[in-house]
A protein has these predicted regions:
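Long, His/Glu/Asp-enriched segments that create or flank divalent metal/ion-associated functional microenvironments
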Residues: 1-174
Length: 174
């Protein structure tokens, strides 16, 4: 169903030239060197790239299964990869600290997803939760709010998937 051995890449776009100096500064506070290392672990190795390489080698009985992967599994694996790299000492001390911020983001994203779609969470409440409790820059939080409004349950996949990966790890260790 899918072509084998296709080339892949991962890139991080710089902030647009049209942004103000203040907005660019905020972007670089959020996407600092340590965040970019964590993001690379998540998006590339051993995160999405590794998982999808294995997934693409799986020969499914149906085209539907081959084309539509599990978002919970995909994001769960990538966030678990971040966690494992930090647990095993990858990078400077700031990398595990950044990973803890990302772990907090997983939890807050799931809360926002649920509360928005089930309890009527307002934009102001969500922004406060993300910026004050989650230490996210305002621009990042605003983008996350738009994402939450435009999709239901996607932001929760990271947290739910991570919980399941950790549950499986615990079972394997027993």
């Amino acid at each position: 169903a899918l072509a084998d051995n296709e080339k892949t890449f991962y890139s991080i776009a710089p902030p647009p030239e049209s942004w103000s100096a203040e907005r660019k500064e905020s972007y670089f506070r959020e996407y600092n060197d340590f965040m970019l290392q964590n993001l690379t672990i998540h998006e590339a190795m051993p995160g999405h790239y590794l998982q999808l390489a294995h997934s693409n080698s799986f020969k499914s009985d149906t085209t539907v299964r081959a084309l539509f992967g599990s978002g919970v599994f995909i994001e769960g694996w990538a966030t678990y990869a971040e966690q494992i790299m930090a647990e095993h000492g990858y990078g400077a001390p700031q990398v595990p600290m950044q990973q803890l911020k990302m772990r907090l983001r997983l939890i807050i994203n799931a809360m926002i997803d649920y509360r928005l779609h089930c309890e009527g969470l307002t934009e102001a409440e969500a922004m406060d939760l993300m910026t004050r409790s989650g230490f996210q820059e305002e621009g990042e939080a605003a983008g996350k709010w738009r994402r939450a409004v435009m999709s239901s349950c996607q932001l929760s996949t990271y947290y739910v998937g991570n919980l399941e990966m950790n549950r499986l790890r615990t079972l394997a260790q027993q």
